[in-house]
Each structure stands twice: as C-alpha cells, then as structure tokens.
A protein has these predicted regions:
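Short Pro-Cys-Gly-centered "Cys-loop" motif that presents a nucleophilic cysteine in a tight turn
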Residues: 2-135
Length: 135
C-alpha cells in the first residue's frame, strides 16, 4: 500500500507505523466445522490479544453482524452461518453461544499452524484433494 495512503490513514486515526504488520497470511479452509471455527477464531482474536474484553467492542470485527445483525458494508454472511438456524434471531443467538465457547485447543493450534504456513486446513481427504488440484 502506498506510503501516502498509510500517512493519511495514520493521521486520520491518530496512529503511527505500518498499516499491516508482517506478511499477509492465507490458507485454504475446508467448509464444514473448519470455516466456522476460523470465523470464531478471527472474531475472538481481539479478545485474546487483550485489545477488548468483548468481541463486539472491536470496531473492525464482523462479530456484531453475526451476533446481533448489525449491518456492515463489507460483510456478507457465509452459507454455513446462514444454515445455523432458520431465522435471523436464532442464528444470532446460536452465534453468540458458539463464540462464548473457546475454540478447541487442538483445532486452535491447527488454525494457527495452517495460517502461518499456508497449509490446507481440513480433513485428510480434503487436503489430498487440494494437493491433486495444485499439481
């Protein structure tokens, strides 16, 4: 991102430094439980980092859209999120309950490892399928 934009952004939000820390990290994620776990992981990151005590307090999170239906310009719900319940209210309640539970420690470690290394996050069969497509 251009230096002028970063300077303007920092001035606008009374901050300093680079806009993004480190390299952008990405990995292929299988839907099913892995995608929802990643969404929970991402939305709870500001809480784990001690930036906020409630995920809804973090301005840049999609948590308020998922948990309370707050409209967000750059947000569109994932199919799996929509399948959590048949009504908006129940989906939001389900999401709040899901995010109130900690992400399983083993799964949390897998998410971190795959996102840091660019490995595929999913079942063995899914990882093999992605590997075949990449070759």
């Amino acid at each position: 991102v251009g230096r002028l934009y970063v300077r303007k952004f920092n001035y606008s939000y009374a901050r300093s430094g680079t806009l993004f820390e480190g390299r952008f990290k990405t990995c292929v994620v299988q839907e099913d439980q892995y995608l929802l776990a990643c969404l929970r992981y991402i939305e709870l990151n500001p809480v784990r980092a001690g930036m906020v005590s409630d995920p809804g307090d973090y301005r840049w999170s999609s948590y308020r859209a998922h948990a309370f239906g707050v409209k967000a310009q750059l947000w569109s719900p994932q199919r799996l999120y929509l399948e959590l319940a048949d009504s908006c209210r129940r989906r939001q309640q389900t999401w709040r309950a899901m995010t109130a539970e900690a992400v399983n420690g083993e799964l949390l470690a897998k998410i971190r490892h795959c996102s840091n290394t660019g490995l595929v996050l999913g079942t063995e069969a899914f990882r093999e399928q992605v590997q075949r497509l990449r070759n």
